[in-house]
Regions:
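Catalytic domains of carbohydrate-active enzymes, especially glycoside hydrolases
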Residues: 24-43, 111-112
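Glycine-rich, proline-tolerant flexible connector loops at the mouths of alpha/beta enzymes
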Residues: 35-75
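Active-site beta->alpha loop and helix N-cap motifs at the rims of alpha/beta catalytic domains
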Residues: 59-126, 134, 148
Length: 151
């Protein structure tokens, strides 16, 4: 086996919803020699219950008055993700996403994402797993916090 180990820079939502910061983080990761940068895509109104979405989020680190607003402000639009994908190509690094819901998975697949990650909290979300499997692309599945039965 001659496959090289792939190094992934986990950006997640550390960009804080700031497009230019995301680009800076991608470039910094590339300069460190990574093969991939990974972020996260979710639709807060899909992932959260109405109660969770509307819960007051009173924190010095909050990006909104409610938890849902906070999460919305950490998300980029599809157009922004497409621009970030082009930027990744320009700096010669690959980009992929952890997806948390079917809507996000579909959007990222239509955008041409070549690899997907399913986070530990979604390992039992069979509808999401089936959907991402249907894309016929590589999938990384985290299993932290999962029992052997869940996996």
């Amino acid at each position: 086996m001659n496959d090289k180990v792939k190094v992934i820079a986990e950006i997640g939502i550390n960009h804080q919803g700031n497009f230019e910061l995301m680009k800076k983080m991608m470039l910094a990761a590339k300069k460190c020699g990574v093969d991939y940068v990974k972020s996260q895509k979710r639709e807060p109104k899909v992932c959260l219950t109405e109660e969770q979405y509307n819960r007051i989020y009173d924190s010095p680190n909050s990006f909104g008055k409610t938890y849902g607003e906070h999460k919305e402000n950490l998300e980029f639009s599809v157009e922004q993700w497409e621009e970030l994908q082009k930027y990744a190509e320009k700096i010669n690094v690959k980009m992929f996403m952890s997806v948390f819901d079917e809507v996000s998975a579909d959007k990222m697949n239509k955008m041409g994402m070549e690899l997907f990650k399913i986070g530990s909290a979604e390992v039992t979300k069979l509808s999401l797993l089936e959907q991402v499997k249907s894309f016929n692309k590589p999938i990384i599945i985290s299993s932290g916090m999962s029992t052997i039965e869940e996996i």
